[in-house]
């Protein structure tokens, strides 16, 4: 699953590829200090957006 986040500190969007929302949250907080979950996207949408993926 591709979980889309927005980080308020850096002002960037990113995808976290994880099996669950809890896992995605842990990964997002590892890389960013203020991530906010936005939505879940399929692989095609995530690829089209071109955001970094963690």
Task: Please state what every model-predicted region is.
Residues 29-54:
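Short, mixed-charge low-complexity intrinsically disordered segments
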Residues 16-34:
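Short, flexible N-terminal segments of the mature chain
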Residues 1-12:
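Short aromatic-glycine-(Arg/Gly/Cys) micro-motifs in beta-strand/loop hairpins
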Residues 12-16, 45-48:
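Short, surface-exposed beta-strand/loop "edge" segments at domain boundaries and coil↔beta transitions
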């Amino acid at each position: 699953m591709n979980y889309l986040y927005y980080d308020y500190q850096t002002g960037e969007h990113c995808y976290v590829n994880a099996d669950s929302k809890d896992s995605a949250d842990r990964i997002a907080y590892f890389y960013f200090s203020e991530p906010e979950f936005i939505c879940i996207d399929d692989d095609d949408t995530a690829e089209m957006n071109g955001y970094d993926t963690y």
